[in-house]
Structures are given as structure tokens and as C-alpha cells.
From Swiss-Prot:
Cysteine pairings via disulfide bonds: none
Enzyme Commission (EC) number: 5.6.2.4
Motif, DEVH box: chain positions: 165-168
Identification of the protein by name: ATP-dependent DNA helicase homolog MER3
Domain Helicase ATP-binding: 34-229
Organism: Arabidopsis thaliana
Length: 1133
């Protein structure tokens, strides 16, 4: 384009001219100017690196802002109403654009927000208010996944412009995320419910390097023909020459890159022509070592150093060298060489950059971040190895195309050079890949198919897809559909298939994936398989970015599993399946698993339970490696295995967190605890029983942790009490290191206490538990949030009864929750545990245990607590039988009973056999027995049954119940006791030990027992009468303590009632219908405890003495039960 046709910045409205520092746009920008600024059509631009494509983004942003300019020419900004989303393949590019656009647009009130892994401080409100969102594909996809349940996707409807930088990323495995989010935006924009929103008319603009199939991308993005712009190498300001050199592979990627250092000097001497050069290395250490190698080589030439051209240059280097704080860098600068990475301080980085721009330093060895950030062009660019170490994946990976193009774009300095040189050093087998890459001959294909099921699940979870029709429509919005029609063989479609059948194949593929998801209960479908709804496993797989195979493995896990089994699940995960067992690693792993020092928590065992002598599989390697790493002091120092271990910990922690939430959903108590502990351990790279727990604190590494361990400081509590000066002496550090270490304790969550107790036992055997959290220390003023999971579960049932996630700084102390728990019926006991498990830190979790005994007919509640035991002495022979309803195990409801008889609560045999569980009694029910309380209580009971006359079972048929009252033996007939003594003669019971034994032996056939008719007028009993009767029954029944009947004996009556004598040590009698044979279960006493009325009538006994006296009697009654003695009095209380 001629210069007279170049567009001027003055063609923009006056409000926007300050956005550009130049007067004219270049030829590429001028040609795209009308479409970018004066229209809203979608566009795709293919142009070489460095041709000025970024300005096109800014023109489209200004076009969007121009809609907010009033007729008067003022800029009226509505915060967040019209959003721009900028998507870049790298965080470095995002941060570069963020700095640039903040500087340009901030004065207009435009807010920019970075959404990358480096920025986790944003909130939903920040996203809602942002005008420009700068993000990477993976992060934008993850943000939309995480916030779907909290309504965090509301900003989608405000998206008006989407800018896609380096769209050729689609050809990279990472391109699946980019394809998924663009397809999501496309299908949402076609949603009828959003037809009135900004998203319905969203504009898409994509730029890329030179690619051969730009038309396919245009079809996917719905770009009209006018919006397709293709520019060749003529648009590049400096012509580039590319050379690709292949080298033989080494044993591992690390050694291969290190070996390439030997070739760099010769390459620079041959191709740089004495001009400036950038050497891109994959790691900081690699950049430093490359600079060291070049400086040492140049030093051998003395005054003939090829990197120093003049004496003046040498003098400037000598002056600058002492200004560098890095001692090693000082020696490199003197040779005309430097290195640049994130490990340098800002002062040293600025010094190196200035020396390079001035031409004093000829060579800089740097990491790939310099390719995206500071503009330091050079004549020659050397890319030392095409692989870099990916921290997220934990292993070496090939550079993506955009990164390589960015590095190559640094070659050539427009003001000084008219040519540039790019040297790529790679392995021999990958030479052809990079030749096609730089020449623009590589066709961009879709990478969505290998992870289609995961992205399909994500759309169902986000409700983008609600039925089969919508699912097929979403797939048609993908780049996969476009390339399937153009190149079906590349996507597992038979060669030669008609193009019209591609759509049918796509539908079959969609149905296949949905059936798989439904089979594993990740989604729900109706009977017709049409409606699609997400299930919790599918939500979790989407939330934690897990592979489908990994989630299947978690779902198929046995119900009950331990911590080591949880670690085995992680080792089988698809996310770390790329880690392989190398031959040279087997000996080291075998030695680690042998564990002669007893360092490891778990080992690989054979079928006999012994430690395996040989590690044979990839999963076994991962398991051993993880155990060695989690000791806190690993014995494996091999770089390759160290990288593998880091990958296990980073990916494993995410997988374990997903397992935790899945088992909470399944209410699996043991699985939840194991997964939670494993997730924290992998995150901290420590087991919870490690002696180096202090490594969790900032500023404490392994050396400091070992030093503290040697002085006995092994816990957070011990560190809080330690002397700062002694810490400095032991660690060999200077003041105020000790104070700093102690201050790091402020990063821990506030200290709390947990308590669990049983507060009530309701009907149907339901226990009410109270779990209380109390904050012991006040939370410190900190921006860090601490969360913990409160879990209440039972071990025997492996069941979670309650779960809540709590923010430790915010809950109101004390915080109490009520948990209803069904008492055990089949098991003899249930161990209830309340656990407060912190999300991040290990070694500070809280656990509390409560023991619940099996529910019995009398519904006595047991609990373990720090309360003195209180016992209800058992009744001797009082029972109530119900003709209509069977006796249930639930507690009796006093309101449903008539007041004509007292309620007698019997204690089960198990209640006095256990030492730890106690019978619960509310404090208000505890009564001190004295003269007044005993007689008052008897009078109250006497009101309910004014006469203890015999009941005629035939006289009240309407009631449907017959009640058997207690019968005893009598020796002498006192006139005032006749109404009581007549009960003894009803069944003709014996009155002494000898007669009792004979009666027991002679009853061999059913007999009859009937109640006598009432023959005299009812009259109430006096207090003295009752106690005399009790006293005589106590003295006249010693034989009952030793009698024992081996088998129960049934006594039949003419009224159709049966009485059964229990074989237990206590005699009792029960009357019920013939179809119900009751059993008397009271225990017979082994020792008679007599009671005299004078004990109660002592008026001079003090309150304290009375308390002690009653406690003594209650204690004796635990081991010695009387038949009709003191315990009968207690049964009324």
C-alpha cells in the first residue's frame, strides 16, 4: 500500500487519538482500518509476527467504546455493560497487554481484569464490573466451570467482543479448551432466551501467524469473505532466514538440553556476524549455565574476544560490572555476555537490558518469558532445544507454535538491520515439524476429539446443553465439525465416506458419549434418552478438570478404603499416565521400597504381604515415589524422578480433592477422611505424622525444619513457646530471624476446640447429638482465608451424618449444630466421630469420639463424657404387659399412659456391665433423698393408685389391657397390712426359702392362677404401712438371692392368661394374653440390703451428709440388688 493511502490517527474521534503514540498506521493496519473501526463484522487476519496485529485489537475495542459517545462528543461509560474478552495462549502475553491497555484506557475509566493462574484474588463482582477481561483459554474455561452453581456466569450476556490472539493454537493439544469456549459462546449467542442481550450479536476477531487453511477457521468463526485478511512475508518489517539443526537424542531431555550448550558458541560465530544475539533456554538454570559456558569460551581468546569490539566497550563493561549484585554475572559482563531471567532482582535486570540495547553486551541467554515481555530485538535468535519443562504437567513438552513464533519474532532490528537469523536446535526426528511450522505449511487441525467427553460433560453441567438436540447443535458449532468434513480420515472416519454422512457420524458419536456418561451416573437422562441433566459425579469431574477415565476409576472404588488405597487411586489416574518407568530408575526405586531405615509409611507388597523386591510397573513407581516424597525428606535426588514426584503431588492433590467431595456426596465416612488427608498431604508434600510439619510455614525449608527438630521444636505449639534467640543460634541465622519465624505462625488458622455430646434420646431410638465448636484464640487480621470441614460420621456404618464447610475466621463462637442419629439395633455399639479437618494444613485437625450403645427395650441412653456416673437401681419384679400392642424398643411416652399405675423403668443387664458408658440423667432430675422428699414422692404416687387392691381381669374388657401388680411373700398378717398381704395369697406363693425351692421343682405342668374378687372396701395406705411392708418383704426374702430356675415355666390360668417365671436370677411374674408370653428380666440380688424407716426420719442429718449417704447406697446397689429393699424406693424416684 502506498504511503498516501495510509490511514492517519487523526481519522479517529478526538477522544481516542491519545491511545496511539504514532501519527500513521502501517499498510496492514490501514487496510484493515475500515472493517475494524467502521463495521461490526467478524474478522480473521493471518500475518507474520511483528507486523502490527495488536493495533487491530485496539481498533476493535475503540469501535466498541464509540457506541458510548454521546451526540455532544463526551464519553459515557457504563461499567461492565459492554465487555471485551481477550484470549491469549500465554500468561506472559496477557500480562504484557494488561500493562499496555491499563496505561492507554485507564484514564477513560475502563477497567481491565487479568484472569490467569497468577491472579487468584478476583471475585464475581470484579468480573461483573470489568470492561476488558484478559485471560488464557484454560483459565477462562475453568472460571466458567467453577462459578456455574453460584451464578457467576451472568457476565456472559454482557460479552460484546471476543479477541483471539494466536488462533493457530487450535492445532496444539491445549487448543481443545480454546475450541470449547468459543463453541460455548457461539451456541449461547444463538439461544432464544438471550436474543435481546449483547451476546446475541457478539463480534469475533482472530489473528494468527501464516497458516494454509485460514478459510476453515473463517467458516468456524462465521467470518464473511470480506473479513478474511491474509498477509505474506512481505508485511514483515525485517526479512527472516531460518535454520533448523537436528541432534542425536540423549538419555533424557535434561541431558539433551545441557549437551546443546557445547554447540552454541560455534553457531553464533557462524551466523550472528558479530551482531547481537538472544539465546532462548527452557529454564533459569539453563540460561545461567549457557552464559557461563559462552563466557568461559570467550575468555580463552583473551584480547581477541569476539564479543568485545573496542577498548571503549571494554571500559564501559568494567564500569558496569561492579554495579551488578550477582557475583557470577559480574564476571560474565566483563566478557560481553549476560543472562536474564525472573531470578534476578529488578536492578540487575535493568542493568543487563540497558547494556544490551547499547550494544555493550553482545549475547543474552534468557528464558522464553523475554519473548513475550520486554522488547529486546536482536539480529540472531537461537532457540536451544524445542522442549521446555512444564510445571503443571511435571515433564518436558514441545513448545507450542505461538511461543516459537514469538521467539522468532525477536530476530531482526528494524532500525539497524534489514535481515534476521533464527536458529532452531532440536532432535533429529522433529526437524521436519519446525521447518513446516516457520514456513506456514502446517494445517491447523482440531484437537477436541480426544477430550470430547470431558467438554461435553462441562457443557451439560453449565446447562449450555439440556437435551440431545442441543448437544448435536453444540458439536456443529465446533471446529471439529468443520475439519471432519474437510479431512474425515484424521478423525477416525472411514476413508471415502460421503460428506453428507459426516453429520450422521457426528450424531452417533454424540450419542455414544452421552450413553457412556449416563452409564456411570455422571448425567441423568429420561426414559427416551432425550433430556440431559447433570449429576454430582459429572459436576465434580468438570469442576476439578479430571479425565473421564480417572473419574470412572474413582466411581468404581470400593465403599470402604484406607489411606494407602486412596494413594493407589491417584497413581492410576489418567492425568499422570505420561510418567513412565525407566530402566535406569528401577534399582533406586527397589532400594527405596526396601526401606531399611523405616522411613516410608506404605510400601509395595506382594501377594504374601511382604515387600516386593522389584518395582515392575508405572503405578508401583508412582506409589513408591510419592511415599518417599511425603516423608518430607526424600532420598531420591535424581532430577527426572524429582520432576515426576512434583507432578504426582500437584495433580494428585487435585484428584484427591475431587475424591473427597465425591465421597461426601456418597456419605462415605472413611473414604472422605482418607481422601481429605491425602489431598492435604500431597499439597504440603508431607504426611501428617512427618517430623517436619513446620515446613508448612512460610520461610521454613528443610534445613531450618531439621534444625528446629534437633532442638525439640517439632510442632506449632512448641514453636510458639520457643525462644527466638535460641532459634537463631540453632539455625545459624541472624536477628531477627527468630522473631520472623514465630510471626509466621500467624498464617495458621485460629485455634478451636470441638465437643460432641448426646443431649436427648427421642422416640424410635433417635439420639440427638450436639457438636460444638469454640474458638480458643482470636483470628488475626489477615487476608488469607482458612476453611475446614466439619464431619460427623459413624465408623461401624461408614456413614456421614452431617457435613458443613466452615470459614474459621467468621463463625460465631461457640457454634453448635444438632445431629439426629438413629441408635444401633444390629450392632452392639456405634462409634460416632466428629472431625474438624482443615483444608490446607496438616497436623492441626481435631477429632472427638462418642460411644452409643445398642438401643434396648427400656431405652436407656449411654454416652461417654466427664460426668460422674448416676444409676437407676433396677426394679425387682414390676412389669407392664400390653395385650394389644407388642413391646417396642422405643422409649415409653408417659403422656399416653393412664395415671392409675406408676411407671417402672427397668435397667438392662448391659447397663451395669460397662464401665465407661453411663446412664444419662438430667441435672434437674437429681434429687437428694431425705425425710421430706421420700414421703412427698410416695404421697404423689399414692394419689395415682389409692388402693393396691387386686384387679379382676374380666372386669374391664373395654380397656384391652391387663396389668399385673407386684406380688411378694409375707410371714405375719398385721391388720393394717392385710390389704397388702392378700396379694401374696392370690397365687399361693411360698413364704420362705425352702418352700420357694420346692415350688420351683414341683411346677412341671401348666397350672392356673387367678385374681381374687374384691371383697372389702378400698382404703388408702399410710406412709408407715408402706414402709413396714417394704421392710418385712426385704427381711423375708433372703432365699431369692440364691434361687435359680434353669428354664422358664409357664403357669396357665382359667382366664386364658399365662404367667412365666424367668430363668434369670430374680423372680418375677408377668400376666399377658396366651398368645404373648412375657419374660421378667430383673436381676436377682446377690446380697440383701435392708431398709428401715428410721433411716429416713433422721432429722439431724445435714444436706452434705445426706448426699454422701445416698451416693453410698446407690453405689452398693450397683453390685448388690435387693428384691424388695432400698432399690424399690429408688425405682419410684
Amino acid at each position: 500500500m502506498d504511503t498516501h493511502t495510509l490511514k492517519s490517527v487523526s481519522d479517529l474521534p478526538g477522544n481516542f487519538r491519545s491511545a496511539f503514540s504514532f501519527r500513521y498506521f502501517n499498510s496492514l493496519q490501514s487496510e484493515c482500518f475500515p472493517l475494524c473501526f467502521h463495521s461490526d463484522i467478524n474478522m480473521i487476519i493471518s500475518a507474520p509476527t511483528g507486523s502490527g496485529k495488536t493495533v487491530l485489537f485496539e481498533l476493535c475495542i475503540l469501535r466498541l467504546f464509540s457506541k458510548s459517545i454521546s451526540k455532544e462528543g463526551s464519553f459515557l461509560h457504563a461499567k461492565g455493560a459492554l465487555k471485551t474478552v481477550y484470549i491469549s495462549p500465554s500468561k506472559a502475553l496477557v500480562q504484557e497487554k494488561l500493562r499496555d491497555w491499563n496505561q492507554k484506557f485507564n484514564s477513560w475509566g475502563i477497567s481491565c481484569l487479568e484472569l490467569t493462574g497468577d491472579n487468584e484474588t478476583y471475585s464475581t463482582k470484579n468480573i461483573q464490573d470489568a470492561d476488558i477481561i484478559l485471560t488464557t483459554p484454560e483459565k477462562f474455561d475453568a472460571v466458567s466451570r467453577y462459578r456455574v452453581t453460584s451464578g457467576g456466569l451472568g457476565f456472559f450476556s454482557d460479552i460484546a467482543l471476543v479477541l483471539i490472539d494466536e488462533v493457530h493454537l487450535l492445532n496444539d493439544p491445549r487448543g481443545a479448551a480454546l475450541e470449547a469456549i468459543v463453541s460455548r459462546l457461539k451456541i449461547l449467542s444463538s439461544n432464544h432466551e438471550l436474543r435481546s442481550s449483547t451476546l446475541a450479536s457478539v463480534r469475533l476477531l482472530a489473528v494468527s501467524a501464516t497458516i494454509p487453511n485460514i478459510e476453515d477457521l473463517a467458516e468456524w468463526l462465521k467470518v464473511p469473505t470480506a473479513g478474511i485478511k491474509r498477509f505474506g512475508e512481505e508485511m514483515r518489517p525485517v526479512k527472516l532466514t531460518t535454520k533448523v539443526f537436528g541432534y542425536a537424542a540423549a538419555k533424557n531431555d535434561f541431558l539433551f538440553e545441557k549437551r546443546l550448550q557445547n554447540y552454541i558458541y560455534d553457531i553464533l560465530m557462524q551466523y550472528s556476524k558479530g551482531k547481537s544475539a538472544l539465546v532462548f533456554c527452557s529454564t533459569r538454570k539453563g540460561a545461567q549455565e549457557a552464559a557461563q559456558k559462552l563466557a568461559q569460551t570467550a575468555m580463552t581468546y583473551g584480547y581477541s574476544n569476539p564479543f568485545i569490539k573496542s577498548r571503549e566497550q571494554l571500559e564501559r563493561l568494567r564500569e558496569a560490572s561492579p554495579m551488578c549484585s550477582d557475583k557470577q554475572m559480574q564476571s560474565y559482563i566483563l566478557q560481553g555476555v549476560g543472562y536474564h531471567n525472573g531470578g534476578l532482582c529488578q536492578k540487575d535486570r535493568s542493568l543487563v537490558e540497558g547494556l544490551f540495547l547499547n550494544g555493550d553486551i553482545q549475547v543474552i541467554c534468557t528464558t522464553n518469558t523475554l519473548a513475550h515481555g520486554i522488547n529486546l530485538p536482536a539480529h540472531t535468535v537461537v532457540i536451544k532445544s524445542t522442549q521446555h519443562f512444564n510445571k503443571e504437567k511435571g515433564h518436558y513438552m514441545e513448545y507450542d507454535r505461538s511461543t516459537l513464533l514469538q521467539m522468532s519474532g525477536r530476530a531482526g532490528r528494524p532500525p539497524f538491520d534489514d535481515t534476521g537469523m533464527v536458529i532452531i536446535m532440536t532432535r533429529r526426528e522433529t526437524v521436519h515439524l519446525y521447518e513446516n511450522l516457520l514456513n506456514g505449511c502446517e494445517v491447523v487441525e482440531s484437537q477436541l476429539l480426544p477430550c470430547l467427553i470431558e467438554h461435553l460433560t462441562a457443557e451439560i453441567v453449565q446447562l449450555t446443553i439440556s437435551d440431545i438436540t442441543r448437544a448435536i447443535e453444540w458439536m456443529k458449532c465446533s471446529y471439529l465439525y468443520v475439519r471432519m468434513k474437510k479431512n474425515p480420515e484424521n478423525y477416525a472416519i472411514k476413508k471415502g465416506i460421503p460428506k453428507d454422512r459426516v453429520e450422521k457420524h457426528l450424531q452417533e458419536l454424540c450419542l455414544q458419549k452421552i450413553n457412556e456418561l449416563s452409564q456411570y451416573q455422571m448425567i441423568w437422562t429420561d426414559t427416551d434418552g432425550f433430556v440431559l441433566k447433570p449429576e454430582e459425579p459429572g459436576r465434580l469431574m468438570t469442576k476439578y478438570y479430571l479425565k473421564f477415565e480417572t473419574m470412572k476409576y474413582i466411581i468404581n472404588t470400593p465403599t470402604s478404603y484406607s489411606l494407602d488405597e486412596a494413594l493407589h487411586i491417584v497413581c492410576h489416574a489418567e492425568e499422570i499416565s505420561w510418567i513412565q518407568l525407566r530402566r535406569n530408575e528401577k534399582k533406586t526405586l527397589n532400594d527405596v521400597n526396601a526401606d531399611k531405615e523405616g522411613r516410608l509409611r506404605f510400601h509395595i507388597n506382594d501377594n504374601k504381604g511382604k515387600r516386593k523386591k522389584r518395582i515392575q510397573t508405572r503405578e508401583e513407581k508412582l506409589f513408591v515415589l510419592a511415599n518417599d516424597w511425603l516423608t518430607g525428606d526424600p532420598s531420591v535426588h535424581d532430577l527426572s524422578m524429582t520432576q515426576d514426584a512434583n507432578s504426582i503431588c500437584s495433580n494428585g492433590s487435585r484428584i484427591a480433592r475431587c475424591m473427597k467431595e465425591y465421597f461426601i456426596y456418597k456419605k462415605n465416612y472413611k473414604g472422605t477422611l482418607s481422601s481429605t488427608l491425602l489431598a492435604k498431604s500431597l499439597y504440603q508434600k508431607l504426611w501428617d505424622d512427618s517430623p517436619y510439619l513446620l515446613k508448612q510455614l512460610p520461610g521454613i525449608g528443610m534445613v531450618t525444619a531439621k534444625a528446629l527438630h534437633s532442638m525439640g521444636v517439632r510442632s506449632f505449639e512448641a514453636l510458639a513457646e520457643a525462644d527466638p534467640r535460641r532459634i537463631e543460634i540453632v539455625t545459624g541465622r541472624k536477628y531477627p530471624f527468630g522473631n520472623t519465624i514465630k510471626e509466621s505462625l500467624s498464617s495458621l488458622p485460629p485455634k478451636v476446640e470441638i465437643k460432641v455430646e448426646e443431649v436427648d434420646c427421642q422416640k424410635q431410638g433417635i439420639s440427638k447429638l450436639a457438636v460444638t465448636l469454640s474458638r480458643v484464640s482470636q483470628p488475626l487480621q489477615s487476608t488469607k482465608r482458612h476453611y475446614a470441614d466439619l464431619i460427623v460420621g459413624s465408623e461401624e456404618e461408614n456413614l456421614i451424618h452431617f457435613h458443613e464447610k466452615i470459614r474459621m475466621e467468621d463463625f460465631s463462637s461457640p457454634y453448635s449444630v444438632t445431629v439426629l442419629l438413629e441408635r444401633p439395633h444390629q450392632q452392639t455399639k456405634v462409634t460416632v466421630k466428629a472431625d474438624l479437618i482443615f483444608e490446607e494444613y496438616i497436623g492441626i485437625d481435631l477429632h472427638e469420639t462418642l460411644l452409643l450403645k445398642k438401643a434396648n427395650n427400656n431405652k436407656v441412653n449411654y454416652k461417654s463424657e466427664n460426668r460422674m456416673p448416676q444409676y437407676y437401681p433396677p426394679m425387682a419384679s414390676a412389669c407392664i404387659a400390653d395385650d394389644d400392642n407388642p413391646v417396642t424398643s422405643g422409649p415409653s411416652n408417659r403422656k399416653d399412659k393412664k395415671d392409675d399405675m406408676p411407671s417402672f423403668k427397668l435397667i438392662d443387664d448391659d447397663s451395669e456391665e460397662e464401665k465407661e458408658p453411663y446412664v444419662t440423667m438430667e441435672e434437674d432430675d437429681c434429687v437428694i433423698i431425705n425425710e421430706h422428699t421420700v414421703f412427698d414422692h410416695i404421697r404423689e404416687k399414692a394419689k395415682c393408685f389409692p388402693s393396691l387392691n387386686p384387679l379382676n381381669p374380666t372386669s374391664s374388657p373395654a380397656s384391652g389391657k391387663s396389668i399385673l401388680k407386684r406380688k411378694s411373700l409375707v410371714e405375719n398378717n398385721s391388720p393394717e397390712l392385710d390389704p397388702l398381704f392378700q396379694y401374696d395369697s392370690v397365687f399361693d406363693l411360698p413364704t420362705n426359702t425352702k418352700d420357694i425351692k420346692q415350688s420351683a421343682q414341683q411346677i412341671t405342668s401348666p397350672g392356673y392362677a387367678s385374681f381374687a374378687e374384691k371383697t372389702e372396701t378400698e382404703r388408702p395406705f399410710s406412709d408407715e404401712t408402706i414402709f413396714n411392708y417394704i421392710r418385712k418383704r426385704s427381711k423375708n426374702s433372703p432365699a431369692l438371692a440364691t434361687s435359680k430356675i434353669e428354664n422358664p415355666i409357664t403357669i396357665s390360668s382359667q382366664e386364658g392368661r399365662n404367667a412365666e417365671i424367668s430363668p434369670y436370677r430374680t423372680y418375677g411374674l408377668l400376666v399377658s394374653p396366651a398368645t404373648k408370653i412375657p419374660r421378667i428380666t430383673s436381676d436377682a440380688p446377690s446380697e440383701i440390703l435392708s431398709f428401715d424407716i428410721s433411716m429416713v426420719k433422721r432429722s439431724d442429718t445435714s444436706l452434705e451428709q445426706t448426699k454422701g449417704f445416698c451416693s453410698t447406697l446407690a453405689g452398693k446397689s450397683n453390685v448388690s440388688d435387693s428384691f424388695l429393699g432400698f432399690k424399690s424406693i429408688f425405682s419410684f424416684l
